[in-house]
Amino acid sequence: MASRRLLASLLRQSAQRGGGLISRSLGNSIPKSASRASSRASPKGFLLNRAVQYATSAAAPASQPSTPPKSGSEPSGKITDEFTGAGSIGKVCQVIGAVVDVRFDEGLPPILTALEVLDNQIRLVLEVAQHLGENMVRTIAMDGTEGLVRGQRVLNTGSPITVPVGRATLGRIINVIGEAIDERGPITTDHFLPIHREAPAFVEQATEQQILVTGIKVVDLLAPYQRGGKIGLFGGAGVGKTVLIMELINNVAKAHGGFSVFAGVGERTREGNDLYREMIESGVIKLGEKQSESKCALVYGQMNEPPGARARVGLTGLTVAEHFRDAEGQDVLLFIDNIFRFTQANSEVSALLGRIPSAVGYQPTLATDLGGLQERITTTKKGSITSVQAIYVPADDLTDPAPATTFAHLDATTVLSRQISELGIYPAVDPLDSTSRMLSPHILGEDHYNTARGVQKVLQNYKNLQDIIAILGMDELSEDDKMTVARARKIQRFLSQPFHVAEVFTGAPGKYVDLKESINSFQGVLDGKYDDLSEQSFYMVGGIDEVIAKAEKIAKESAA
């Protein structure tokens, strides 16, 4: 009994000593700034006002955000903003690939804040993605983390990633954090904007039902694009998405009065370089003293970039386009190649952050990530953004979650088919799968609408007859069906067209076909005016006049 009382007494004493040690150690670990902050009452509305300033709207003037701090200047570590913790210094605690954990003793940065690694060979920007607790944040690197070590100092910039915007970006190539990568010196401007912004409010948005003529027959006739709308180019690997988007830049940007922004998201560096050279040759981009006359800005985050850069470069390109729309009232063309890589990069980031994957291994936030980008691409009362997006379709499966989620945001879809490309018909646009909200008699007029529907009807009938032809042959068809097949094959070949950007490969000069000429030409084929011409004369030509000239040439060659 006495031994039990002695044991209980010893346990109580040790517990009291341990509790005292714990309370003393906790008291020592509380930062003085935290105790001062808790004892001082916050001014009324202070945090609310800071939150309003931190969250920038899409219609905010371009001159408000300040230039991002340069890592070359030695920061003092003094906090200049209590809400964002700007100016505070943290330390790298863990590096796993593109994910970097940083600890801040004070001045914890909010989500999406940009941090800059100090004493680094290159300017390395990190974006806060998660708060882990105990003053630790998990960030995504916008560049390679080679050479980064634990204990390295990190500066809290107090704002999201901020990039230069305005006319100074025209004719230049910038990366995800707004640095010039064309070796033509830094971009000199007073206008900077954060890449994370809200979509325009409902009252600011406007919709106009106006067709955007591209000069490409199959697009203008069967799936016309809306000015100020969102257009998707769907296709698997190697069916011609990038060539089509380059032809659109060539045709539309030349005839278009406003500015263009091209965002290269996770695509081949070679193609980005080719596009830059072609733009210089065609006069879309001008160098030297005439740079201010350039019509296009390029934003690149290519295949070799870390997932953080590929996940954010689309937002950088969109921010540049938004400035032209909101501050200058321009009608802007935004080309994104490839929007699937945006989804793919966000999937990589999601896995690195430890989120449980959703369907087919994609991130659970797939719809949210895509919606945040797509909803900012819109037409306002000040100006418009017409977006053309190349969309890679994994394994040619249009039901894959990535392309399927994108469908909901688009006004027109141009589907590129491998079966059509195997026939040697380029652009390999599927005339039956491609759709457009603009295909209405109230918008296009009766002539255009009836011609487009007539072409689709003939092609659909031909598709239905192909099984019969494969089993029984052409001889078993009725005379009407034989005529349908003959006209469908001519229409199929007439939808092909030589491109300006493909002249170096094909040797054939590119053709730009006016919309009225396209309508009249196809209506003539439907009416049977050209039934006597051979199929071959309809292949890779512009208007119907070229078809007749080619048919005469073929007839002369065969007669000789």
UniProtKB/Swiss-Prot annotation:
Regions crossing the membrane: none
Keywords attached to this entry: ATP synthesis, ATP-binding, CF(1), Hydrogen ion transport, Ion transport, Membrane, Mitochondrion, Mitochondrion inner membrane, Nucleotide-binding, Transit peptide, Translocase, Transport
Compositionally biased intervals (Low complexity): 33-42, 58-71
Transit peptide: 1-54
GO CC, alphabetical: mitochondrial inner membrane; proton-transporting ATP synthase complex
BP GO annotations: proton motive force-driven mitochondrial ATP synthesis
Top-level taxonomic group: Eukaryota
GO molecular function: ATP binding; ATP hydrolysis activity; proton-transporting ATP synthase activity, rotational mechanism
Binding site for ATP: G235, G236, A237, G238, V239, G240, K241, T242
EC number assigned by the record: 7.1.2.2
Chief subcellular location: mitochondrion
Biological role: Mitochondrial membrane ATP synthase (F(1)F(0) ATP synthase or Complex V) produces ATP from ADP in the presence of a proton gradient across the membrane which is generated by electron transport complexes of the respiratory chain. F-type ATPases consist of two structural domains, F(1) - containing the extramembraneous catalytic core, and F(0) - containing the membrane proton channel, linked together by a central stalk and a peripheral stalk. During catalysis, ATP synthesis in the catalytic domain of F(1) is coupled via a rotary mechanism of the central stalk subunits to proton translocation.
NCBIfam families: atpD (TIGR01039)
Entry-linked HAMAP family: ATP_synth_beta_bact
UniProt family annotation: Belongs to the ATPase alpha/beta chains family.
Name of the protein: ATP synthase subunit beta, mitochondrial
Organism: Nicotiana plumbaginifolia
Gene that this sequence comes from: ATPB
